[in-house]
């Protein structure tokens, strides 16, 4: 299997391992290798590589082995388009990625024009699969589902609370915040404050002062863990006692590293944790034996490869358009997420979102625990 890594359009050395150095089916892994969301990129890469090794060890797809090329999109839409164009030029047939919705959506258009099928383990913005393209799939849920769950939970558990909805102005963060706000408004609850902040913001003192002045006691965050961790820590430092709730953008143990003890009690939505499925115990152990905790998007990426390989077998072809048709018509596929089928848009027919709370374990470390 061949593996290459490039950032944007810069191509690095080829590393060959196992079998022939040049395989027949080229799969691109489009992820943030560097930048603020690199932790999620590592999850997606580890999951995809492990699943591809399993597929190759079993003979590949329709008798052809899979090769990997990795593109670093740095969580930037422009870099994502560069990665997509490079993948197309290199003859990539299938893409596992991207992670950020703001990167995945424009990249998907490049892939569609070049006959490339894309499966995202992490892009939750509804627009991704609402474009009417033939090639867009995801193994995660959508923000309209996630926002509905969050909004209902806040309404049910924090009646008469003063709620602030804060987002990071990205397609993912603002999209999720807006879906949560929409559900709250439908239920008759009006947010006290609705604010956007910039990705990379470090000092939230002015925002926190505004939250305190407004008497806010619930903060909903649409965004990623780097900013969330700082906001949580600074809220505690500045004496703002408010329940912090967010979405799947904070499901990284790095959140606890940034927020410190202030992370205790933070809540977030995410899909049911596949690590809890006893059927995955051997696989989970294999990851951990190598020093990697397969949290968050690791197994969503693994499932993307599994469904892709099984759909190709069902189609009897490695042609992306034939595989896309099989993915929509030939499921369910056996995956680490359970039996996985896709609808006509490419969205998964999976159990919805559930609520998690960050708690300190017996080992003294914080983790997100399903409620």
Curated annotation (Swiss-Prot):
Keyword Signal attributed: yes
Cysteine disulfide partners in this protein: none
Glycoprotein listed as a keyword: no
Any single Pfam family the record assigns to this protein: Peripla_BP_6
GO terms classed as biological process: amino acid transport
Coiled-coil residue windows: none
Signal sequence coordinates: 1-23
InterPro entries, sorted: Leu-bd, Leu_Ile_Val-bd, Peripla_BP_I
Keywords recorded for this protein, A-Z: Amino-acid transport, Signal, Transport
Gene3D superfamilies (UniProt xref): 3.40.50.2300
Family the UniProt entry places it in: Belongs to the leucine-binding protein family.
Function: Component of an amino-acid transport system.
Protein known as: Leu/Ile/Val-binding protein homolog 1
